[in-house]
Amino acid sequence: MSPNSLIFGVSRRTLLSALAILSVLPETLLPAGAQTVDAGGPLPSWNDGATKQAILNFVGTVTREGSPDFVPPAERIATFGNDGTLWCEHPMYVQLAFALDRVKAMAPLHPEWKDKQPFKAALEGDTKTLAESGERGLMELATVTHAGMTSNEFGKIVTDWIATARHPRFKRPYTELVYQPMLELLAYLRTKGFKTYITSGGGIEFIRPWSERVYGVPPEQVVGSSIKTKFQMRDGRPGLFRLPELNFVDDGAGKPVGINEHIGRRPIAAFGNSDGDLQMLQWTTMSGGVRLGLIVHHTDEAREYAYDRNTSFGRLDKALTGAAVNRWVVVDMKNDWKRIFAFE
């Protein structure tokens, strides 16, 4: 997702810096069929056509022993963005929705917020004023609502929120708004000897606790943005304490860096949906050999959302232009997917 796109008038990088500290979700919110491959054939929620065939051809080429393009299992690394690639990112990022709700939940203990910006704007849903507060305002919101506690304490807050929060349009838990075709793709790749990694601009601690249940991706195969934490003994007990200080933003040019630091191997397949995935796609597909780059293009306003170049969330501009030049596969969500969510 593009560091240059604007979210409430502030940069995507600023949002990620502010919200990288999110932690855990409950293990019970597994969408139906999230980790299965249909016995009747791979990718059952994908319509037959050029897009599906490109995926199958790539996998067949790199996994067929004797092929000149055969890739050993140890080198079969596939990386996936999260927001907009694996689950819904509109009308706003889930982590931003959490931050705004957190301000409202804490407001009774802070009566001064009703007259103090940017808290006043958050309480009133005044996005215009939130935008005018800029980077400093957003960081202030994040610092107050997300830091100054242990990881366990913050995890409990997030767990309680995710259990009751619902998407404003679909009225379902956010963890049910994962894309069934992408879940099938993850599972299919694993049956072919791939290791599947999440490489998200979102908070690494926000994704890791539930990624295995929802996506089949274990926590050690999640790469994301983070804040600094500090180990301390308090009252004779060890704890990791969250600090209001950025550690790493896994977005844009940071994604290849994060992949290299966490994985130690260059992917042979990368999947994204926005300009924030551009450098990951470039780094993957320009490494020589048979490689796959794929972009999820949101084109289905009826079943989900339709957006690309003109949006504050998940802007797809440079990467869409680069897809033709680099021969990346572009998924037309409306025409390539039989269904988007498991509950359809």
Region spans (language model):
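N-terminal secretory signal peptides
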Residues: M1-V10, A18-P26
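A metal-dependent, Asp-based hydrolase signature
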Residues: M92, A97-E176, Q180
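Short loop/turn motifs at secondary-structure junctions and domain boundaries
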Residues: P68-P72
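C-terminal cap/substrate-recognition subdomain and adjoining C-terminal extension
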Residues: L19, T36-P42, W46, Q53-L56, ...
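Asp-based phosphoryl-transfer active-site loop
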Residues: R76-H90, L281
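N-terminal post-signal-peptidase region of extra-cytosolic proteins
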Residues: T61-G66
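Short, solvent-exposed loop/turn and secondary-structure capping segments
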Residues: E89-M92, A97-L100, P209-W210, W283
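Signal peptide processing junction and immediate N-terminal pro/mature segment
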Residues: T28-Q35
